[in-house]
Amino acid sequence: MKPIVFLGRKGLSRMKKKVIHGSVATCCAAVAAATGAVTVTPTGRYMAVPVENGAPKVMLEVFDGGRRVAYDQIEWARGVTNWTGSLDLGAAKGRPFEFRFSGKDAPNLSAADLAFSDSRYPAPKGQYGEPWRPQFHFTPPLGWNNDPNGLSCRNGEWHMFYQHNPFGITWGNMHWGHAVSKDLVHWNDQGDVIAPDDAGPMFSGSAVTDAADTAGFGKGAHVLVYTAAGKPHTQRVAWSLDGRNYAKWPHAAVEGRADANRDPKVGWYAPGKHWTMVVYGEVEKKRHGVSIFVSKDLKTWEKASHVKGDLFDEGKYLYECPDFFELPIEGEKGTRWVLTAANRQYAIGTFDGRTFTPEVERLAQWRSPGNVNPVYAAQTFADVPDGRRIQVAWSHFDTRAGGRADAMFNQGMSLPMELKLVRAADGLRLARFPVKELESLRAGAPTPLAGFNGELAEVEFSCEPVADSVVALDVRGVAIVYDAVKRTLALNGKAVAWDLDARGRLGLRVFVDRVGVEIFSLDGLQYVPAPDIVPDPAKRKMSWRASGAKKPVRGVTERAWRLKSIFADR
């Protein structure tokens, strides 16, 4: 099914002059027009959708020969057009489509209100230089994103799909956006690959490479497993042989079996030569949890077991977006399985191919100053050739903050991080590290903090604080303060508990973007994401100081790199 369209009152006849940002759009031939509906023969694959942030929403349904092929709610521009979305009509060119729109503010349209193009409508020049767009984190070119989906590596190419609203900068109209990368750092957006259909909006899921063609789609097919969020929710499958064009399998792989079920994560269990799927599922509208299914062919699934989470009135352990993977224990023989969920909590245990047995539960993946969930719905890449387990999470920051009504996108993703399973003082724990590929963004040799002058930065700082000291870093106006008495680290005044390493040293690795800060410490065991912190654009310097004793710190090491934007060529 293809994306969706909403048509404006005065619409594209005027918009073509103001909004298409220099792209060439052709008009269309109208067969008939009536209040609430117009039949048009599109002259291109993509229809321009003018978006006015905050405008009243209208529902548009698109019909091809009586079959509904698209539907969405759109903040269709009535005054100022903030940006232009692209409705993919697929092979629509040359035959009539009916566009029906409804709602309190539904417009009356004619053929002259619509414009089409054979290519997606481009973003305006300079879009990636927006003052509120991160410069080395992934963000959608246009529209809203939330959960990362379908993270996978195939034929030397990294794939990141994501929950996407292509026609607004708030949640809704869930499609799967798609971006690809050769290095995990620079991403090229490919447009949406699956769109809402009669089974429902396209909620979260995963992707695998079916090397042995167990599903019969073709050897090496790239298979997406996702939730269609109709009533009831169902788990469904789409596939591609070229990694660009995806077709939906017309049946449900898993029918709705609980009050709510969604967000399938699929993996290959080699000892049993079968696929596994973990799916979030509510039980009797009382308890969160994760169900485990098994399959030989990615199409037919058997429920094998269930892992209980919190009761609704207790908390959100095992709530939404599960991930499930095996990791070797660093420096030891053996492995363990890790089960994560959307709101940072995870469990470590054993798995026999059908049943997960937790050994320790309700562990925290990250620390959160102020915002309980600064990042959410973390997922890991499948089929990574070198065996690394790499995670990306949805970063919460609002481009509308501070009264910015003209934003063309909203939200983004965390840095990609390599996960390892280590034995810490209190048992097995996940540790995380920025992927090595990020080092390619370093621009020249590092300097001491006092010698830094720039916008984008990576900072390494280490020292041994004495018992009553306070160590403060000023990183482009962002205050990072360690208090040895309180044993806390504060980020712009919001503190979290903080541990020193076994040698009594404070070690920080800090990434500073145009929007957002991420801190790694304690050999990967401490991670603080702060995507909503905005460094002062006028402040480009760094410094540090220590107080509280005659010699408050020992053994200081420090260095800072300027980082390059991933959009330097755009």
Where are each of the predicted segments found?
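Beta-propeller domains
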Residues: 161-188
